Amino acid sequence: AVFGEPGGKFEWVMTGRHLTIRADGNSVENTAFGGPIFYGHAVEANEKPDHPGNVWWPQARLANEIFQSLDGKQREKALLEGTPPDSDETVRLRGNASGIQGLPGSALTRDQRDLLKKTLKSMLSMYRESDVEEAVGCLDAHGGYEELRLSFYKEGDLGSDGIWDRWRVEG
């Protein structure tokens, strides 16, 4: 769907059960893409632990590198019970990180924060460079990587291998 007028303030949104991607013409002030992005991919009805053919699995592997680098106290904050609900609330902007569960970026070491940057760079790699620059600019204007929250969810750990299949970066 296209909202607004291309050439002016506009937003293009494609959404479905496991997908919300966006491109915008600065339709919402201080908000990259006009709102949150969300994606998942299930190649098969019953995914295998290594997710063969899943286009987003390389990003999950990067996120799991962050988890593996965490110490015990950090893991306690980052690893949450359950899983996020499948609802409209899942993909709404929620403002600053207060009230968002997970490990704050401010609790990461420099090396861990570099892994977070690498993960986010991969997550944004399919977007235009101008959109990526806007996203990073918005992030910097709101406190940077230190203000993000990183969450991994116990439910849905395929293979019970401690490689977290469901995770989020928010803030």
Q: Each predicted region: which residue ranges?
A:
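Generic serine detector
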Residues: S27, S69, S87, S98, ...
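Acidic-enriched, low-complexity/disordered segments with a strong bias for Aspartate over Glutamate
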Residues: D24, D50, D71, D86-D88, ...
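Acidic/His-rich structured neighborhood in mature extracellular/periplasmic domains
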Residues: A1-G102
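Accessory structured domains or lobes within enzymes
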Residues: T90-N96, Y127, D131-D165
